[in-house]
Amino acid sequence: MAPQIDAVILAGGMARRMGGNDKGLVDLNGQAMICHTINKLSTQVDQILINANRNQAQYEQWGYTVFSDQDSGYLGPLAGMVTALKQTQADYLLVVPCDCPMLPTDLTARLLAALEQQQADLAVASDGEYEQPVVLLLKPHLAASMQAFLDAGERKIDFWYRQHKVAVESFADQPNAFVNINTPEQKQQLATQIAK
């Protein structure tokens, strides 16, 4: 029987480099940026969750479960991840950011294969050159470790990774899949690229 896999889209940040605009709701070629991410994930997972710390009513319009970080104060992606891990009943949780509209359509399958083959706790995507720290598949039992890490005042996701067995899956065959949008200029460049 195939494992159940849920996904959480992280849209809980403050988006300082986007002028404070909620990145998931920023228009990209006629759709909110998060819609591009949802479209890439909808056939890859059983259920989609959205982590948003503001504008929750707007995120709810897509019909998915929306939740804020359990710990207030914009503590970074780990805070959204640990809350999602505590909510899911799935065998695995896929984590992606809301500002990555070109995710691979085989993301989940390849991360799962890497995790299982290497008997790892989590699998992280790489663009062939750099690891993508917030594009990963992990087991829900890691919630306790992640919560303890946050409770100790830690925030750096790669430091938390080092406590666990990590598989890295290269997507060098799709080098632009993890292009993310942090500034209005990057948004315009990607909008032009998508329109071609």
Curated annotation (Swiss-Prot):
EC number(s): the record gives 2.7.7.77
Keywords annotated in UniProt: Cytoplasm, GTP-binding, Magnesium, Metal-binding, Molybdenum cofactor biosynthesis, Nucleotide-binding, Transferase
Q: Where in the cell is it found?
A: Cytoplasm
Tell me the superkingdom of the source. Answer: Bacteria
Task: Name the enzyme group at the top EC level.
Answer: transferase
Q: Which residues form a coiled coil?
A: none
**What are the record's GO terms for cellular component?**
cytoplasm
Record's comment describing the protein's domains? The N-terminal domain determines nucleotide recognition and specific binding, while the C-terminal domain determines the specific binding to the target protein.
The name on file for this protein is Molybdenum cofactor guanylyltransferase
Its source organism is Shewanella frigidimarina (strain NCIMB 400)
